[in-house]
Amino acid sequence: MEHQLFGVIEGFYGDPWSQLERLACIDALAGWGANAYVWAPKAEPRHRDAWQDPFTAEELSNFATLIHHDDRITVSIGLTPGSTATIDDIIIKMKPVVDAGCRIITLCFDDLPVLDAGRRHRELSHGICDQLGVEVLLVPTHYAGTTSSPYLEALCDGLDDRVIVMWTGNSVVTDEISVAQANTRAHVMGSRAPLIWDNVPVNDAMMSSHLHLGPYVGRDPKLRDVVSGVLLNPMISMRASLPMIESACAWWRGENAIDAWSQCVDRDDWRIIAEATAYPGELHWPGDRPSRQWFEQVVALPPCTDPDISPWVESARSGARICLAAYDVMEGIASGSLASDLTRIALPLLNLRQWLQTPERTLGSGPRTRPVFTQDETGRFAITSGVIVLTTSIVENFVHDVNRALDALEATS
């Protein structure tokens, strides 16, 4: 491949983006200096589950529109072939896509129980390159970690340079990717620079309770010098994915990713909900006990019409109301009010149980679950720390404060 790729791979589980959302993403990517978009949504039936079925005329027309929408963005169309797929099967399936203008095919062999298929995946890739005259982005079955495996050895032994192999980092989702890790992965792939499938800000599967609205962090700037590129896997909400994508594009350009994110969330009014969906340790975490003014800003968030975002907005507003009630109670105690005078203003505290049961996690509520799995020397997944992180929410902190204040009040009565 003549140049590195940077952009987005729509590769999540869950409701795929619409055509309009994909076009809007391509517009944003082009404006921010990226150069790639990959269509590979797991829930699109003819991408994965019904992979042998021909793409419909509408799908092919949509692909052509994406491919030719902006010549600054290279569009690749992906396929997850089944375990019995032959080269001819894939040629028949993908030739209409190539005829529509696609010059890079993405073959996705991730999350398949075929760790003995390295040689076969190499041969399928070569067949596609040779017979369709395209380059191939390949998602291997062993896609995480830095160890070698029989699968990777078989895949990379004699693999054509027209095939670029993806890698997610040391685990499926990872907080950091270093140059040393990328170099080790390149070594076990026969000195082939990996193309990073970066699983941020994705919120599918076990992460579906979370919104990831923070900046692009934890990626060594020098990674740009040792990889074939970086593709971000976004969230089900295209719009909510944009703050991190814009931040990542700044990182790719060698600029300050944090500053770019900050400008984005202020410009597009994301900051408060971004802070409300953060966790301790993240740069946009508002603190364990934010101010009354901050909670008032959360409550004042306007209702959201986007169904992929609105549940988190409502969850944050509900939690903030509880915290404001806690402020009222504690200020009442401090001013000398009797417990009987505080009953009415304390009633919102009783909503804590219902709020904790809300599926959408906000204000630090847990548990926080992420697929922090690596792959070992056999290619099998291995659990690591961080898969489940137990947290105490901001709301619980304030309710604890109220209880302590009431205990102290009773002790002095």
Label each PLM-derived region with a short phrase.
Residues 51-52, 87, 116-119:
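Short, solvent-exposed loop/turn segments at secondary-structure boundaries
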Residues 38, 106-108, 231:
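Conserved beta-strand positions in the central sheet of alpha/beta enzyme cores
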Residues 253-413:
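C-terminal functional modules
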